Amino acid sequence: MERERLKSRLGFILISAGCAIGIGNVWKFPYMTGKGGGGAFVLLYLIFLVMLGLPIMTMEFSVGRAARKSPVLAYQKLEPAGSKWHIHGIVAFIGNYLLMMFYTTVTGWMLHYFYLTVTGRFEGLDSDGVLDVFNTMLTQPVIMIFWMVVVVVVGMFIVSRGLEAGLENITKIVMVTLLVVMIILAINSFFLKGAAEGLKYYLIPNISRIEETGIGNVITGAMNQAFFTLSLGIGAMLIFGSYISNDRSMLGESVTIVILDTFVAIVSGLIIFPATFTYGVDQTSGPALIFITLPNIFNKMPLGRLWGSFFFIFMSFAAFSTVLAVFENIVSCGMDLTKKSRKQVSLFNMILIILLSLPCVFGFSIWSFGWLKPFGGSILDLEDFLVSNIILPLGSLVYLLFCVSRYGWGWDNYMKECNKGEGLKMKNWMRFYLTYILPIIVLFIFVFGIYDKFFK
């Protein structure tokens, strides 16, 4: 069977950017920027994106394009005879499932909050009332199961329709809508009373805040955010490399995707900080920002129901674009392994992922166990820890070593594939850094993540 191909370069860029763009761009990056000294943090973040994320992204794409296989079989085609690199293909495949075991639920939260906002559920509520809405959702599994099932069924239906007719066409609509809604929200924020103060806090370098947070924490924070924002290490980018032509270089395409991901992260702060300063709300991050702080702000804002609806459809699309990309990876791996049709594999995985997502849902109520406290307190936190702190950094390290080591695919093969086509080219002078220094940095990120979780 001839391998499917993406119809257009735009489709490839938007799908790959959609995979990279996720909820972390919104609920983590702006908060870390504010705490990390504003523009100084952004500068560090951009430096680390170029140093860390960009090279590894070119490697995932290059392996995918050279192999023309899904992550689970790509190593087998490219690795030296008798080597064991292909074991990571299975680990990456499992990592995709583990990510979806909680990401489908969180995407469902976004859809639920879009529905609540559109129907006026938050109108007239004080801060305690808004908090109660969030707690009610967490303690009523039926609500979360319903929205999680909606996410999985719709996502798998789209993927089952084929690469071009399903994933590519729908992702173009989702991503363009996401970017347009973002810009509308940012423009609205610029006209709020506290916009100037909020933007100053967000973007102007502030040495005192760097000293307060600690220069070491700011540097490691920027490094971690730059590394994890691109969803590298589980083959989510590799799969789309396998669908594209040889017309463009992988570095040039990766730069475009990184720019889109960074644009979304920075504009998220342009939306959030003017609002928090206008209404005198403390800066927060994570679920507290999205599901408690911002609904309170929209309650106080003129036309808040409208702007809140825009915001949660933006968040839903940001999360759903990642879901679609990972679903495609899972289905492609399943097709390669079983030789079954796309529709058969999609139906099987739709049922499987719904079942695998249930522990996350029940982890806030009947399956809330004390032993989960070191990970954050819930099954979602445990699953997130395994993906973010174990599978992603170690997976990125494997792709990196596979491309630079003579015991793997090797530097020459990587450079030849990466530099095919028009666009920016990787240079041979980068070899020392990519071979000897970058692996140490990635290993540091892995070790620091474990230390920060359990020993700090």
Question: PLM features: residue spans?
Answer:
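A generic transmembrane alpha-helix motif of multi-pass inner-membrane proteins
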Residues: 372-401, 423-456
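Membrane-water interface regions at transmembrane-helix termini and the short interhelical loops
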Residues: 32-36, 84-100, 135-137, 150-174, ...
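Loop-to-transmembrane helix boundary motifs in multi-pass membrane proteins
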Residues: 5, 11-13, 19, 141, ...
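Inter-helical loop and helix-membrane interface segments of multi-pass membrane transporters/permeases
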Residues: 3-4, 32-36, 66-91, 104-164, ...
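Membrane-interface "cap" regions at the ends of multi-pass membrane proteins
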Residues: 1-27, 56-61, 65-78, 82-87, ...
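Select transmembrane alpha-helical segments in multipass membrane proteins
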Residues: 5-16, 41-44, 83-97, 145-151, ...
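Membrane-embedded translocation segments of transport machinery
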Residues: 2-6, 168, 172-320, 324, ...
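Transmembrane helix-boundary motif of multi-pass solute transporters/channels
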Residues: 11-48, 235-241, 251-255, 259-260
